[in-house]
């Protein structure tokens, strides 16, 4: 019987995203004034400017969807609730490590680092694997209890024991079904 879990994680807007959005709308205001001053008959440009600003603003709203089917991990990046891009697709047997994030983790040792969490600081677990396309890959994530359980169950027993040991050493509680779904 197949086992499946999924989680939608909305990325919080940080200071960087807020500045980008503010600059976009400030640019629209300045360009609108210039259009009104120098090209009054071409006011359709104002509508196009506003639409373009809205479209650019929406690109700052990012969500990650974790899907785990029989231990295989897929992560999609959803931009502005309209564009979906698969950023990770790895079979359970190809996962090298599934461990809690600790100070010992060195992202610079990887060719590709993907932060599929609110931020690097809020990521609770990571997955590593080798990709033919991208090389050694590190994925930082925040799985809820169901996604964690499916990833955990998809790993061989030796990797499950390593995860349990790493969680004990790091003082990280293993997520359980009683945990809040997030």
Residue ranges and their predicted role:
Residues 69-87:
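Membrane-cytosol interface motif
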Residues 1-4, 26-27, 45, 166-182:
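Eukaryotic intrinsically disordered, low-complexity regulatory linkers and tails enriched in Ser/Thr/Pro
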Residues 33-44:
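Transmembrane helix interruption/hinge and helix-loop junction motifs
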Residues 101-123:
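Cytosolic, membrane-proximal regulatory domains of ion/volume homeostasis and mechanosensation machinery
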Residues 47-72:
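Transmembrane-cytosolic junction motif
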Residues 87-106:
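Structured surface patches comprising rigid loops and adjacent beta-strands/short helices at the edges
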Residues 1-28:
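N-terminal membrane-targeting/pre-transmembrane regions
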Residues 116-169:
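A membrane-cytosol interface segment of integral membrane proteins
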